[in-house]
Every structure is written in structure tokens, then in C-alpha cells.
Amino acid sequence: MNPVIKKFQFGQSTVTLETGRIARQATGAVLVTVDNDVTVLVTVVGAKQADPGKGFFPLSVHYQEKTYAAGKIPGGFFKREGRPSEKETLTSRLIDRPIRPLFPEGFMNEVQVVCTVVSTSKKTDPDIAAMIGTSAALAISGIPFEGPIGAARVAFHESTGYLLNPTYEQLAASSLDMVVAGTSDAVLMVESEAQELTEDQMLGAVLFAHDEFQAVIQAVKELAAEAGKPTWDWKPAVANTELFNAIRAEFGEAVSQGYTITVKADRYARLGELRDQAIAKFSGEEGQPSASEVKEIFGEIEYRTVRENIVNGKPRIDGRDTKTVRPLNIEVGVLPKTHGSALFTRGETQALVVATLGTARDAQLLDTLEGEKKDPFMLHYNFPPFSVGECGRMGGAGRREIGHGRLARRSVQAMLPAADVFPYTIRVVSEITESNGSSSMASVCGASLALMDAGVPMKAPVAGIAMGLVKEGEKFAVLTDILGDEDHLGDMDFKVAGTAKGVTALQMDIKINGITEEIMEIALGQALEARLNILGQMNQIIGQSRTELSANAPTMIAMKIDTDKIRDVIGKGGATIRAICEETKASIDIEDDGSIKIFGETKEAAEAARQRVLGITAEAEIGKIYVGKVERIVDFGAFVNILPGKDGLVHISMLSDARVEKVTDILKEGQEVEVLVLDVDNRGRIKLSIKDVAAAKASGV
């Protein structure tokens, strides 16, 4: 196959799609280059046969950043890339979410997408290039796929408006970081963080991105027309309508009644009984359908029952209408020895959230393609199996936990104080102790409460809400505060977090086409109403950050010294600063501009370290009396230490008003004496007097 190259303009960038030169044994492979700044190789491989033992669609997406792409050698002992970084995991999810709903219903062949960043100038994020490449590789592969998709990143400035595919530098000055993906007709996925933008501004960004990435979709279609493989001859299994109708006639009413049970565990138990009865009645004997087929059809009956009830205006599974938030129970300060804690319960979803403050040395060190950087804010989300009443694997965080933790982090990050105002490292951990829908948004509310309980001076409290959608034909219902079942059975998962003033995070995943601007407007409006309701209840418990940090939190003292004194504080080979830290049990961080941060586990430890630093950096003041120690006696006087590292000379003539024959008649080494600073010459030599102390005291010095 001869290489095929397609170039197109995407905003200010030139994008090149190339296929037929690299990775030719993959089902589909595309090399994407954006302005010679970023190059990503995307491959797609699809299994020709489905695994009959799998009852789900086995799609996997792997995004990987090779260090050679940025001209770096990996760290560590083995000097090669290891397990996926958090950034790689999040980008894999970002690519997976818009493509998954576009594979046809019933397609169970394994599909693996691998996106490899092979070259980068470190100016822009390679994720958009990887998404474009995934769309193109799937489009030319012949695998059944209802694409292609386009993707774009959007920034926003009050003065200049929306900006397409910004650089890292432009993003740093932006009040919005949003990634949008979708087809020519519809938006399928949104991931964003913002600095209190309005709902209209957020919706405007989504529509702006959708308009702009039409150029991507058109270019991918042209590439597929020229280099695409024939579409697979795949057809979905013929629906067994006879079995469906028989099971629905027998169990439809009972299923409908089962979905009026408001307690999740009781509802699941009843539906489980009905499912077992259906399997027993309609399978098992020779010539009858398999148990898995009956189970699948029973699930379809559940799906249709819940959706029909909702769009026809009947109460939801737990009896609520479409706009009501489940009952809230909010507590703060629930764990006595932590720095800040909150227990946030919304219906059957509960999060125990804990905030911990640390020193600058506790910041997370990130080794990225752009270089090493420190992250002073971490938010970790844990979802143990007991939260849904199940036994399960315990271990490291999975992709879902990393994704939910990042969404919660995005939601509260904009409201954290600046590092120069509050220079602590902050770690928030959300333990999901019960779950029935929207645990990530419970984590947002709990994180805001725990941070305020810890005394972190938040700019404003933050709350989050998850919205859902059920659409049947022209009928639709937007649901506030969705349950787990409504998330699973619905057409949209739409999470919005923010303050009373504006939105700080928006995440949207849509499973169907036909989500109109009107539906998104309604969802954002209902979300605002729910968010203000939740914020009102949170503010009744703790309306603003505590004025003092927890007694368990480390004490931080900030100070500044002259830059020429830094070497004195550090000492030869770091000996001085190491001695201060060991003796006071505090930690000291010194910046090149002379800024010093002292962290102590107690106030006393931090203050002791501060006094030591002050002593080292202080200058002898002429006319001031000091208590010093005699360090050395010589024939012509005595050297007295008045400040750390600073000795002055008391000449023999300055010891007493009477004549002194020998210095040792008056002073001994190690003796403490009061001395007056008479002068400091231009070489820093200090001239002291003992005999003038009394007169200086009398004059009020």
C-alpha cells in the first residue's frame, strides 16, 4: 500500500494525517502531526471474531508518552517507561469516552486502540492529536464504527473570547480548559475546568468547539474515502422478539413494581428474585434459550420499564420528581486527629473526606514530557467494594478512581488560595463509604467542607451535582441528582460543579445522538438550581473557612532574608541548615530570592527555627546592647560572640574605667557579659565596649 497523506487547517494549526507507511499490520494506523510540534502514532486492531464468553464490548484504549519524544531518558533504575502515569490514564479515558458509544449495539469483537506520542516540542498537549488519530484510524480500519469524531481544546479570556487549541502558555492565562469531542451532528463528550464561568459561557465553549472540529471530521472522511478498508460484513444478532414478549408478559408488571422499591438493597434483591424466576422458567431445558440470553432480555425489560416510566412523568425509582435532590446529611470535624474532615451523605451515597496539610517538601514530584514539576495539591478518590455491598479486589487505584479523583480536583482547584497566601501542600482523600450514584460529586462537596474545616482559606465553597437524561423519540426528561441505576439506564451523564457565582468543572458523556442545545441548556439550568440548594445546606454547617488551622496541622512561618545571607543560613555543605532542622525538629525551605518557609510540627518548633535563622542573618546594630559570650582572650582584649557567627572585639581599654593590666583579671573564656556595639567598619569588624554599657543603659538604650 502506498502512503496516503491528508493535510488540513485546524484553527491556527496545520494537521497532517498519514497512513500506509508505519504499522501496516494493524487493522488501521495513522500518524498525526500538528505543526511539527506533536507527532502521535495511533493504531487500531480489531478481532475478527467475538469471544462468546464475554458479555460486554471489550474495547481498550492505551495512550502512552515515550520520553524519547521530548529528547529525554527515563529516570529510575531500569531506564525505561513503566506503568502508565496519571496523565496517560486520564488521556486514555478521554479518548475512550467519545468513541465507545459509536460502536454498534451488539458488537462484541475485541478492539484495541494504542496512541503513542513519538515526538513533541512540549508546547501543546498531545491529547487532541491522539483523539484525531483515533478517529482517523477507526475510520480507515473497516471496523463497524458510526464515526468519525472530531475533538478540540478550548480556552477562554474575558477580553479575547474563545481560543481554539491553546498552547500550555496560553492555557496558563486562561479561565477555561475544556476538551470537547463529538460527531458532525452531536457532542458526545466534554471534560473541563473553569474559574467560575457562567453556564452560558460554558455552553458557548461547547458549541464553539463543535463548530471548529467539523474541519477534522471532513478531513478524516476524505482520508477514509481514499485509504479506507472495506467495512466488515458484520450484522447484529436478530432480536428474539418472541422471547422478549413472553418474558415481558409474564414479568413486566412485577419488574415495574420492583422499581418502586426505594431502598437500593431491597430493590436489587427483589429484581434478582424475578430474574432467577425468569431464567428458571424460560431456559434450562433442551431447545430453550440459554440462561445468558434470558438474563440479557430481562435486563432489556428493566431498561425499557425505567425509561418509559420517567418520560411519561411517573415518579423516579426512589419516588422523586425530576428536579429534587436527595436528602442531605452534612457533618464536619468528624475525625478528631485529622487536619480537616467531613462526612457528606446524599441519599444512599456517602463520602468521608479528609484534608491533610503538609510542607513544601510533601508536594508531589511529577516527571512529565515537559520536565519535572511539583504539584502542591492532590485529591485522591477511593471506591472500595463495600460501598456497594460487594466483595471485590482491594489494591491500587483503577482508571475509574483516577478519573473521578481528577474531576473532583478540577472542581475545587480554582477556589484554593494562591501559594504565596497559603504555602502548604494539600492532600484531600475521599473515601466512598456508600454509593448509589454520583459519588464523584459527593467527593466535591466533601472536599470543599473538609478544606474549610482544615482552615484552608477557600475563595468560595464548591458543590457538585450529577444530571441525567432519558430521551425516547421527541420526549425527554432531564434528571437532577441521578441514582446509579439512572446513570446506567440513561442517555447522558452530565456532572457540574461550581460556586454560587459560576461553574468550576463540567463533565459530560452522552450515549446517543440528538442531544440539542435546548437539552444542554435545561440540564445546566437544573444543575445550577440544585447546586445552589446544596451550597445553601453546606453553608448552614460551615459557611466559611475556619480562621485557625487545626492544632494537629504543621505550623508555617514565612520570612524573607537578604539574598547575600542565604549562604550563611545554609552553611558549608548545608551543615548550618541541617543542624537547625535536626535541633528544632522543623523543616526549612529557602528560595533563590531569599524567601524562607519554616514548617514545624508544633508552633514552638517553628518559632525556635525562626529565631535561629534570625540570629544568623541579623546584623550588629551600633548603639545596641547585646548579651554575649567570651570566645577568646588575647593580650589586647577579648573577642565576644554577640550573634551566631558574629564576634566583636572588646579592646583592653574598653573593659573598665579603671586601668586594666591583664584581660584575664576581668574576663574568662565562656563568661557571659553585656556589651555595647560602638562601631562596625566597612570590613564588617565589630568594635565593642563593656565599660560604656552602664552609661548607655542610663541614657535609655
UniProtKB/Swiss-Prot annotation:
Binding site residues for Mg(2+): 487, 493
Keywords: Cytoplasm, Magnesium, Metal-binding, Nucleotidyltransferase, RNA-binding, Transferase
SMART domains with a match to the protein in the record: KH (SM00322), S1 (SM00316)
Keyword Mitochondrion appears in the UniProt entry: no
Swiss-Prot/TrEMBL catalytic activity: RNA(n+1) + phosphate = RNA(n) + a ribonucleoside 5'-diphosphate
Sequence similarity: Belongs to the polyribonucleotide nucleotidyltransferase family.
Designated name of the protein: Polyribonucleotide nucleotidyltransferase
Organism encoding this protein: Pseudomonas putida (strain W619)
Gene designation: pnp
